[in-house]
Amino acid sequence: MKIVTTVQDMQQITSELRASGKSIGFVPTMGYLHEGHATLLRKAREENKIVVLSVFVNPLQFGPNEDLDRYPRDIDRDENVAKENGVDYLFYPSVEEMYPAEQTTTVEVVKRTDVLCGQQRPGHFAGVATVLMKLFNITVPTRAYFGMKDAQQVAVIEGFVTDFNIPVTIVPVDIVREEDGLAKSSRNVYLSQDEREEALHLYRSLCIAKERIEAGERNPEIITNLVKDYIETHTKGTVDYADLYAYPSLTMVEKVEGRIILAIAVKFENVRLIDNITLTVK
């Protein structure tokens, strides 16, 4: 595995790889890699000749009161995970390398961002889209891999890639969970022992809602209220949202049918966790 720290070197490498006809699987991350990231890397390894991993904590996608400085970082650990999962090139640029001068252009996302996390984090998805535009131009991937834990992000990226005719295939990968059901996340390290137990109820609430839908409930308000009530009863966390939308358009539905997403965000003392399920309802 080779570690690359400059845009120029990474572009030269990927340009030569694509010229030689090799497919490139790209996994963009903010580091502090866990089994969810490893799953993305293994999927990329299976489907491509070359695997490129980027580790970059992107300041553009953090708001003024968010956890940019607290976001966990451990490049030695990330290097080990990368090596264990078949990464060929680890792209690890500094903020100064990615944004060497005042940014004159950003990508504004006008759909799919006014709900769920986008509603709580104005400017977040503009930051995501901007850094991905740069990373796609730098790594020139054949395929790019994203976890469905950030399902809104996946929907935004798919739209952005289509709108700008970017020649990359977006590959969504199912949420990776701990054995007890908690969605793996770099932010889980902020949970206290009691909160770690309570956090299990996020996924349980989604499973209960799914069972209710499968039993025939089609009223979205009944489903979302069920989730909110369950979480408020079983945890000390604060429900940021528990919402149901069509997916990937993220538009309101009057009836639970077609492909939908049921998504939740819950604030504990030191961390905000998200989770979701997507399903197709006939």
UniProtKB/Swiss-Prot annotation:
Localization: Cytoplasm
Description of how the protein assembles with itself and partners: Homodimer.
GO molecular function: ATP binding; pantoate-beta-alanine ligase activity
Note: The reaction proceeds by a bi uni uni bi ping pong mechanism.
Pfam family, one: Pantoate_ligase
Residue spans crossing the bilayer: none
Catalytic activity: (R)-pantoate + beta-alanine + ATP = (R)-pantothenate + AMP + diphosphate + H(+)
GO cellular component, one term: cytosol
Residues that hold beta-alanine according to the record: 61
Name listed for the protein in its UniProt record: Pantothenate synthetase
Record keywords, A-Z: ATP-binding, Cytoplasm, Ligase, Nucleotide-binding, Pantothenate biosynthesis
Job description of the protein: Catalyzes the condensation of pantoate with beta-alanine in an ATP-dependent reaction via a pantoyl-adenylate intermediate.
Pathway: Cofactor biosynthesis; (R)-pantothenate biosynthesis; (R)-pantothenate from (R)-pantoate and beta-alanine: step 1/1
GO biological process: pantothenate biosynthetic process
Residues annotated as binding ATP: 30-37, 147-150, 176, 184-187
EC numbers: 6.3.2.1
Protein family: Belongs to the pantothenate synthetase family.
Cited NCBIfam families: cyt_tran_rel, panC
UniProt gene name: panC
Enzyme active site: 37
